[in-house]
Every structure is written in structure tokens, then in C-alpha cells.
Amino acid sequence: MPDFSYGATTDRAAGAQRLVTKRPDLTMLSRTADSLYWVSRYVERAEYLARILDATTRLTNLPHAYGGAGTEWHSAVLTAGCEEAFAKAYGEANERNVCDFLTFNPDNPSSIRNCLALARANARAVRTALTSEMWDALNSAWLELQRFEKKRMDREEFARFLDWVKNVSLVFDGSAYRTMLRDDGYWFSRLGVYIERADNTARILDVKYHVLLPDTEQVGGSLDYFQWTTVLREVSALTAYHWVYREAVKPVLIADLLILNRRMPRSLAACYENISRFLDLLGDAYGRQGPAQRQARKTLSSLSNTQIETIFEGGLHEFISDFITENNRLGATIIDQYLQ
């Protein structure tokens, strides 16, 4: 599976270009736009890592009668997109090593600690472009994170920590939605959210592929059901699933909800609907459409014109891997087009 593409920090060259716009009220520096984009991506990524660890913990806490797959912690590393870095640092993928690597390890660029640190660093560099509520959410989170880091956490405290990380993202996202002016700063911030969220939804859906069923367990059995239910729970979609489909948990319907259903906020289709909208707003404001707009429309069109049965026929894992590659490519195109 493709690795995470790491973002900018605050040490960009001082000679940032001013974005050319046909609207006099939009005069943002590319450096400012870049930082706003990456603040949102890093906060969203921290939440995703918390969801991955929460899901993995649930899978490993199955009653003994179910048996375990024994691959859950390795799957967490694979799904986080950092298998090679983890192997160099730890080797064995057990609970202690994976939790340490994905939460507080300062040498992992995409640990929760470093995601929140980089989000705060980028936010501080463009402090005047943020509302006070957004800055307070990040600054308070950073101070609280240091208190968590000093604690000796048992499983109960670790679960509280993961819930706290998810809440940090909700507070920051809500602050941005409620307080930012609807201009190019907001549009770049939302692009960061949805590019990252699309990547994360694809990866957390793929976690089921990497958690293998034991030889004694059948597809459609109790363990398989529990694993798929965990996937739904970790994208806050269990209630939505039953509301939309009104039947027992089925893999094909879960994939339909998380890939193609635009009513589901974390679905790939919903993410790309928003990505296309915000890119079009930027294109209109800056007076030209470019490769980013074309790539986003192509992906949205593909998602709109496919059926979930077609995806399963070609292989769900293969579809997700291709999607992650294309999503990373769009992220790079946005940077080239607007943020360099």
C-alpha cells in the first residue's frame, strides 16, 4: 500500500509567491495557503491514527471463544502506511511497539504526537490567518498532549487518550467551520481535510483486507461479522449503515457506504464531491482551471459512474490501492498548482 506523503513544516523559503487572483479581496501568499492546507491534513491524520489504534484494540480484545487472527497489530502498521519505517525501528509488530510508534514516537514523522506538533507549528507560522478559536484548539491540544505523554497509561487510560485525539479533531474542525471567512483560506483548509480524509477512509476500509481470518473461521462467520462491524464503528458509520440499508452487516454494503454513498460524510465520493467544489471555487477566484480541477473531476466521475459490484469483481483491495495512489497524485498536483 502506498506510504503517506508527508507535508510541509514551517521552514519554507521566505520568498513565497503571491497567488494571482482576479478578485482583489483574495491576496493570499502561497506559503500561507500551504500552511493552512497542512494544518488541516495533520489534524485529520492524527484523528485517523487514533481510529486505527482504536479499531485494532477492539479486534485484539475479541472473546477467547472467537479466536484471534493474530495479524491485527501488523495490519495497523500496514494500514497506517509506515511498514518500512516501523520495521527499522522495532521489528516485531506487537501491541506495545505499534502503540508507541503510532502515538508518541518522535522519530516517526506521522505519529500522533508529530502530527499535532506539525499542525501547531504550521498554525503558529500563519497565526493571523486563523481564528482565535482554531488557534486555541491546537494550542490547548498541544499542552494536553504533553501531559498525556508523561503518564504511564494502562489500556483504559489509552482508550481515553484515543478518544481525546478524536475530540481534538472534532473541535478544530468545528471551529474552522463555524468561524472562518468563506474565502481562499477556508477553501485551502477544507481541501486539506478532504484529501486526507479520502486517504484515511480508504485505508481504514482496507484494514479488513490485512486482518486475515483464522483457517477455522469462515467468511460470513461471527469473527468476520465482528471485524466488519469494527470497521463501521471506527468511521462513525454503524448507525448510518443500519439507517441506509436496514439489514445485517454485509461487506458489499459497507464498501458501498464508504466508497460510493455521498450521504456518508467520510465516503470517498463525498470527499471528492467536496474536493471538486473547493477546487472549482479556487479556479473561479484565480481565473483559471488547471490539472488539479481536471484530476478531481475525473476521480469524482469515476466514483459516480461505477457500481459496487464492479469494484468487488476487480478486487476491493486493488481498487483501494489504486485510489490511494490517485489521491496522493492529486495532493501533489494541488501543491504544484497552488502551494509552491
Predicted features by range, described:
Residues 2-10, 19-340:
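Alpha-helical transmembrane segments and their helix-helix packing motifs
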